[in-house]
């Protein structure tokens, strides 16, 4: 059963009509999978002085109404499923002013019969006001004003059911910096966060979240240049130069014993790396690529980051309780500059930027701490040739061995949490979408530049005409894809931030490659490859995008062996020029 679990607070007296007033949490929405809850403390009846709180609050000199957004049909279906599966509600809560408060005990007693009958709508009175508990829509309806308030409950089996909560058009009173008067900053801003809190024993867990939802990005990260929301905006050269730092020694001089390589280490979730340790980890992991200039290492540092870390550590405890071992690891996540500032505020699900499909499935793809060069291939390149990688703590829990189902987007069973490519020595981790905001904590951002990066396919490189392939380089790396100008170009290719050259290996036409792999690839996969190739020829797909999809479908090992075999064969009859199309969107490897 899927259940919604958030901060639950017992009430001891009625100051606002539904329970003791507590420090307001941040504008977070919370929802997670079901966790069993033990019996909770009873709530004493309110005193006679309770009053219904005003629905409007004054913020920054203006009256703003806390908006509870319309739910989608999908959410209503989910709520209906909750209602069908739930037992008898033993504890009912309302979400007001940023916190959950209990429905008083005497009201629960008054509507006990309706609760036991599992009535979809129950009418009751409190402090002279009439309300309806709408369990199907998970809301409480004020019959006088029509105001709706989110509704949650805990049943007799200890299962918690919470809706999705949204708050917009307001700023928290706990901001520690003054928000600039700007139309963009004052625009409605929704924040949604997945969190999971286990409720057990007679204690009620408490978690205070303080946040400033400042879209300007101020105080979002310490020492990390914050990205603007629009991808059309660019870094200022002077700003970049002032932020950049050079490695004091070449990568080749780093001693591997000095680096902290934790891909196989079992962490408790409490270890904290410093920037120097992250530099060493990155340097050792990319040593096979040659000298990799690290421009900067920044830590996500803000009140929001601290709140997310607290949630992550709570999730570690929960996973450890249910699995025996949380199995926390460090892992690398490729990132785009324009979404970095939104990661802490909106989570890794922001715009779907981190969700990717591969031969292992659909989800958040990370690589082991000692294999950053694998993630580097998916890093976008900004206009200054800078790439970005995020070092994350990841709760892997019980790991599932993934067997190449590209359509898989959730675990293969309740006994698994996330997936890996190898149980004993994993290099690729997949965190399913349902866990992406609870099982991953982004901690550091590494800004770096690379020349002749194997398999790096940035957005700007994708605009070039042709791509070549060479098999030189580290043995464990896939073929190197290099950007170069086509026959119409000037003869030199200057991809952004690097000095790539023409391919060192002979040019390989796509049709020749397809013919060679056709008997080794499934028929459906070949149909997909041919369809993508047609889009490439029609200029509906960039070359870099096509090559990336080809590598995902076929696999780097098969491409490597096939290209090597074809290159070692005697030269055959010249391929017709109609096939060897040098226009953008065609050609070969």
From Swiss-Prot:
Database matches in Pfam families: PARP (PF00644), RST (PF12174), WWE_5 (PF23467)
Record's compositionally biased regions (Polar residues): 481-503
Induction conditions: By ozone, salt stress and cadmium.
Note: Plants overexpressing RCD1 show a weak rcd1 mutant phenotype.
Biased composition (Basic and acidic residues): 571-589
Name listed for the protein in its UniProt record: Inactive poly [ADP-ribose] polymerase RCD1
A GO biological-process term: jasmonic acid mediated signaling pathway
Keyword Hydrolase recorded: no
Domain WWE: 64-153
Functional note: Inactive ADP-ribosyltransferase that functions with SRO1 to regulate oxidative stress, hormonal and developmental responses. Required for embryogenesis, vegetative and reproductive development, and abiotic stress responses. May regulate several stress-responsive genes. Seems to play a larger developmental role than SRO1. Does not bind NAD in vitro.
Localization in the cell: Nucleus matrix
